[in-house]
Amino acid sequence: MNPTASREAIRGGEFLIRKTLPEDTFSPEDFSEEQEMMLQACYEFAEQEIHPNVERMDSLEEGFMAGLLDKAGEMGLLSVTVPEEYGGLGMSFNTSMLIAEGIGGTGSFSTAHGAHTGIGTLPIQYYGNAEQKAKYLPKLASGEWKACYCLTEPDAGSDANSGKTKAVLNEAGTHYLITGQKMWISNAGF
């Protein structure tokens, strides 16, 4: 039995204001064999696919980063927390953090991976309606589609509360028009 299966996940900084018992504490010794195998797969992926090709990545070779994300998708590294019903692995937050650790030393790939799996996919997973989840999550989980994210605006910087850009439904009701300007879109280069 997985020792973490019966534990309740603590959200964000909740540990600061909630009584937490010692047995609720998670440590690396609590990882399952499956989680350890996933971590090893990350290390091998980095060693075989990324580290020997750092120059290609750093020189922004066209298609290289997207190709790495494709391979990560084939390995399941883009779908760790995505529910199984949408083509994901449906694994725990702890597992996703283990994956992040495993690819953390891969330079800009770790940023592209984090933008895809975190700020690009999680908002749909957490807040999307059923139709949005069914449309986007399977293709994001497989790597067929790449997620990107943009917060920064010329007059607001990265202050989300000062942003002015909006998506406004057109008069025909067929699509949205973006009003305003965004800058520095993570993962937009591919």
Locations of the language-model features?
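Intrinsic disorder at enzyme termini
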Residues: 1-34
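Buried hydrophobic positions in well-ordered alpha/beta secondary-structure cores of metabolic enzymes
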Residues: 35, 46, 76, 83, ...
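Generic secondary-structure signature for well-ordered alpha-helical cores
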Residues: 43, 47, 51, 55, ...
